[in-house]
Amino acid sequence: MRPAQTNQFDYVKIGLASPERIRQWGERTLPNGQVVGEVTKPETINYRTLKPEMDGLFCERIFGPAKDWECHCGKYKRVRHRGIVCERCGVEVTESRVRRHRMGYIKLAAPVAHVWYLKGIPSYISILLDMPLRDVEQIVYFNSYVVLSPGNAETLTYKQLLSEDQWLEIEDQIYSEDSQLQGVEVGIGAEALLRLLADINLEQEAESLREEIGSAKGQKRAKLIKRLRVIDNFIATGSKPEWMVMTVIPVIPPDLRPMVQLDGGRFATSDLNDLYRRVINRNNRLARLQEILAPEIIVRNEKRMLQEAVDALIDNGRRGRTVVGANNRPLKSLSDIIEGKQGRFRQNLLGKRVDYSGRSVIVVGPKLKIHQCGLPREMAIELFQPFVINRLIRSGMVNNIKAAKKLISRNDPSVWDVLEEVIEGHPVMLNRAPTLHRLGIQAFEPILVEGRAIQLHPLVCPAFNADFDGDQMAVHVPLSLESQAEARLLMLASNNILSPATGRPIITPSQDMVLGAYYLTAENPGATKGAGKYFASLDDVIMAFQQEQIDLHAYVYVRFDGDVESDQPDTEPVKVTTNEDGSRTVLYKYRRVREDAQGNVISQYIYTTPGRVIYNKAIQEALAS
């Protein structure tokens, strides 16, 4: 076994590649001196042998063997021939995984403009050439000629566009016997673009732009600054403008655009293979037409088709008709693979599935405390499995990991007791996408619950921007003691009451909570069932309400010896009754107090409703805990 290679990356940078660099990516020299890497045939695999065709899109000589330690012709098999290059087929005997990173290239018979830099917003080619995008497109797609050098012609200017008729007229003048015209050069297509870009002296251009900017104003100044910024970036990165026109295009490794055989013997293939095949076919046809000196109009048409094929490969649908495959589905180009939510960056590089994490729908947990969340049992046993196994072995209930896993899979009752011990004091982190601010991920103490949904305290919903209409949340388990301590001290929901953006409380009662509190404490003169009854304690009132002896809003007297506050002053007696033993009963608006002869309070009954009793008791219990 070879040690695993670990490549450390600081960052990934996207830039322009020179034709030489693209060749370096794909070119390799075999021990016999043969240089391989250029893909020249559109074939993929042989339909009889099911082996890759040589010099095709899946060529084993270019990309490496299709089977581990086996060459194309079968002369060398087994790992003992490692590193040998077969004399017959030229395939290096190595692992097949090299087909995931070895690249090839296609040498184009005519230059082709890169569609990103031509049709992107902004169009860097048109900015650099200081020409309207419409004019640049006319040149690239063979609709107009462009003057590359006006020579001594007074009627022509550099970068002037000419129609077919205008060019024929000038051509007649050039080739007439008494012609005075000299040094007139006109081009069309990406070749003309390549020449125009190569003629730009970036340093000189930047210098003259800086001088112009000093005196320019308004729209013109903004345009000059935009152009200068692009030129400065080219100078800073060491890229050349002519690299925006490609003479060589890379062929990505075959295992990244696979071709697999289905059950019925048919093949399913990546769209990229179809797009590459179109490019190779048109490129080969163009090379053949140039060889046989075909008429200019035919060659030009083929060049335009090659440009369109490369456009479709890089960014299908950016310009012109979208290339479609079977059942009129647009083919996925290189741009489609890397951009968007399902693209390589967001799907595979930035967002990865991690261990010790789960995901489920959230439901409201009204009985939870603010720092708690309800974690489904089957999710908790999976997330905390290593901790549970460790605890089972340490307690002597099982001897090894295999036995512990068997015990867990049988849902043994003892496992749940161990799980309860493990999760006690072990916070978990809940995250709801999109995490737009730091309160989008918070820590909670898990409480085991039945069912498959995560229970969430309603007060923390505004921080997560969560509601219970089908939202999902991810659970992450902090493993190390440091991360657990950090989660508990910094991320616990009860420590995140204020919004980091505004400094105002983000945990505020709303909706059901406000409505419920209002309904419990509201007055309803129509509620008369059980009104005026006396009760010895708060619990008796709640019990009577639960047994439907009294209405929620009926006013009753309940014994309560603590302090009483009301929204209106309640110090003036309404009625005072003196008893035979000298004690007296004082009736206030909201309470009834019995005092002895010395004025000491014997008992106090408050005039309230069962709803207010329930509300008051809930707050008292919350404060006491």
From Swiss-Prot:
PANTHER family the UniProt entry points to: DNA-DIRECTED RNA POLYMERASE, DNA-DIRECTED RNA POLYMERASE SUBUNIT BETA
**Any Gene Ontology biological process:** DNA-templated transcription
Molecular function via GO: DNA binding; DNA-directed RNA polymerase activity; magnesium ion binding; zinc ion binding
Name of encoding gene: rpoC1
Q: How is the cofactor bound?
A: Binds 1 Mg(2+) ion per subunit. Binds 1 Zn(2+) ion per subunit.
Residue positions annotated to bind Mg(2+) are 467, 469, 471
**Reactions mediated catalytically:** RNA(n) + a ribonucleoside 5'-triphosphate = RNA(n+1) + diphosphate
Give the record's keywords alphabetically.
DNA-directed RNA polymerase, Magnesium, Metal-binding, Nucleotidyltransferase, Transcription, Transferase, Zinc
The record describes the protein's role as: DNA-dependent RNA polymerase catalyzes the transcription of DNA into RNA using the four ribonucleoside triphosphates as substrates.
Entry's family note: Belongs to the RNA polymerase beta' chain family. RpoC1 subfamily.
Cofactor(s) demanded: Mg(2+); Zn(2+)
Enzyme Commission number(s): 2.7.7.6
Which residues take part in binding Zn(2+)?
Answer: 71, 73, 86, 89
Top-rank taxon, per record: Bacteria
Give the protein name, as stated in the record. DNA-directed RNA polymerase subunit gamma
GO CC, one annotated term: DNA-directed RNA polymerase complex
Q: What class of enzyme is it?
A: transferase
Organism, per UniProt? Nostoc sp. (strain PCC 7120 / SAG 25.82 / UTEX 2576)
Subunit (UniProt)? In cyanobacteria the RNAP catalytic core is composed of 2 alpha, 1 beta, 1 beta', 1 gamma and 1 omega subunit. When a sigma factor is associated with the core the holoenzyme is formed, which can initiate transcription.
InterPro entries associated with the record: DNA-dir_RpoC1_gamma, DNA-dir_RpoC_beta_prime, RNA_pol_asu, RNA_pol_N, RNA_pol_Rpb1_1, RNA_pol_Rpb1_3, RNA_pol_Rpb1_3_sf, RNA_pol_Rpb1_clamp_domain
Please spell out the taxonomic lineage of the organism that makes this protein.
Bacteria, Bacillati, Cyanobacteriota, Cyanophyceae, Nostocales
